[in-house]
A protein has these predicted regions:
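Intrinsically disordered, low-complexity linkers and stems that provide flexible hinges
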Residues: 1-8
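Exposed, interaction-prone extracellular/peripheral surfaces
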Residues: 9-201
């Protein structure tokens, strides 16, 4: 069994599944838990901007987009391939945005352009359905031990949690970051994924 040894700064040889998000948020630097030596070279950002059926705060969605950009920038800086899938739509094409995996400054620019062109007023596909269609029910998509999936979603609907539980069983290495307003909560009661709260002040 692996033993937890502490927290230190991230290096390009670390596995992304060992990122300590709370320490990263606190210090401003990407930090990892020391205990696992496997290496992940691909990260897929799954950005959900659907309403939760409750009060919707523009600041939470804006923070989620900003967080996606920051996550992409940090991983690309470390030489890791990054892809992005979202249910938000492009302002002109009116279609859900996405970008295939890639690395380098040019790829980061493409990701930032895609994020900047999102029109949050356009109707969005339910994220659970998007994940089902794109991954779980798509036999051509193979699971990879070399990938980490970073979910950024303030919505914590029961159906979405149950879908992500199936996703984790098939693909593994899922990190769920929940942007939430100060005084709110970010628990995931319908799946076994441990949430990382991201407070929006």
């Amino acid at each position: 069994p692996f033993v937890f040894r502490g927290i230190r700064d991230y290096t390009s040889n670390d596995s992304l599944k060992n990122v300590n998000w709370k320490a990263t948020a606190r210090t401003g630097n990407l930090c990892v838990n020391e205990y696992n030596e496997s290496v992940s070279r691909n990260v897929c950002i799954l950005l959900n901007l659907e309403d939760d059926g409750m009060l919707t705060y523009d600041s939470v969605n804006e923070e989620a987009i900003s967080l996606a950009a920051s996550v992409a920038e940090e991983f690309i800086r470390q030489g890791i391939n990054v892809s992005l899938i979202s249910n938000a739509c492009d302002v002109d094409t009116k279609e859900a945005v996405g970008i295939r995996e890639g690395a380098g400054v040019g790829h980061l620019g493409s990701i930032n352009t895609v994020l900047a062109r999102m029109d949050l007023k356009l109707e969005k596909e339910e994220f659970a359905e998007l994940i089902n269609r794109t991954f779980i029910e798509n036999v051509s998509v193979q699971s990879s031990d070399n990938s980490v999936y970073v979910v950024i979603s303030a919505s914590r609907r029961k159906k979405l949690q149950q879908t992500m539980q199936k996703f984790e069983k098939k693909y593994g290495q899922v990190i769920w970051i929940v942007p939430y307003m100060t005084g709110g909560e970010y628990s995931l009661d319908y799946c076994g994924i441990r949430p990382e709260g991201w407070e929006v002040k």
